[in-house]
Each structure stands twice: as structure tokens, then as C-alpha cells.
């Protein structure tokens, strides 16, 4: 199957595109877009990959589901389009950045600038029905995104994987801690942020690790 995705990712993920589960997933997604309002817009389903080529990835942040409100999701986990009110988790992410490294919250919740520096902002499920959180879970996306994470973890070394909350931590359980830095904490959601997300210093710890391995730090 010919999938429109950035070329270096295509080289690593083509075996997935040729599997039966991905064909079934594609049929499901096409059907959903034809009948319902689905986020993100179809052209942005693989935005995380297109903005952050395989060879440029330095950091991976794993999310769960795209935002399901109008105008929010654009294919990057935790990120929203310019001009959209910051969701609560993103507010808390910016609070932790301020406390950790002193950088003030930006005027936009659009994290494209992180992606362009080598931060793969990957949701486990890449599509969702409007106003129905989790509606596209267990349809095959998780298998595909597992394959993407595995390709990175096996082909590269000295990456930073940031896993907030139990869902992301389970998804990243197979990552070799001897080859990569794996940072875990509570999720930035208001329900859990005070249980270990605040004060995790993941942003400075990421940059310290990158610097120690000869990589440019991320401008958070």
C-alpha cells in the first residue's frame, strides 16, 4: 500500500503498510472520514512523522488520542493549532517548563517548533471522532505506532523517550533502557499533575542527556 508519509519513515514502516491489519485500518479510517467529523483533518494524520523525519528524531513524547474538539488536533500529541485555547494538560506542561528551565509559556499551543527540532509528538491512536474520546482505539493504530517506536528504539541509540502516565509507560515498556533515556512520571492532566508530573524536570533532564551525547539541546 502506498501511504503518503515522509520518505525516511516510509522506508522503515513500509512493512507495516503491507500488513493485513493496516489495510483493515485504512478501510475503517476512510469509511469514518466519509461519514463523520474526524480529527485531525485527513492530510494531518501523519503530521508527527512528516514534521520530524526518522533520521532527525532525538526525543519521543507519547500521547494517547488526538484532541476531539473542533480545531484543536493537528497530528501532534498535546499540541493545538494556533489561536486555540490551551487544553489543561498543555497548560501544565508549560508550567513545568517554566519551573524547570525558566522559559515562559508561549503565546501559542502549537508545538510544531518542537517537532522541527527532533521531538516526535506521537499519539498512540492517530484519529478520533469529534466529541468521542477514544472512539478509534483498538482499530490498529496502536499496532502501527508500536512499530514506529520499535523502529526508533532498535535502529537508533541515545534517544529520550518521555512517558507521562500509565498508558504511555505501558506502551514504552519494551524500550531498552541501556540504549536510551526513558523518563517517566504522572500525566500532566489536572487529575494527576500534582502526583509527580510537576517537579519531574523532564525538560532539563532531556537536554542534559542530549548534550552529554553530542546532540543539540531542544529549545523548549
Predicted regions and their residues:
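A polyanion-binding, active-site-adjacent surface
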Residues: 3, 15-160, 168-170, 175, ...
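A non-catalytic structural micro-motif
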Residues: 195-197
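Generic N-terminal amphipathic, Lys/Arg-enriched alpha-helix
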Residues: 1-13
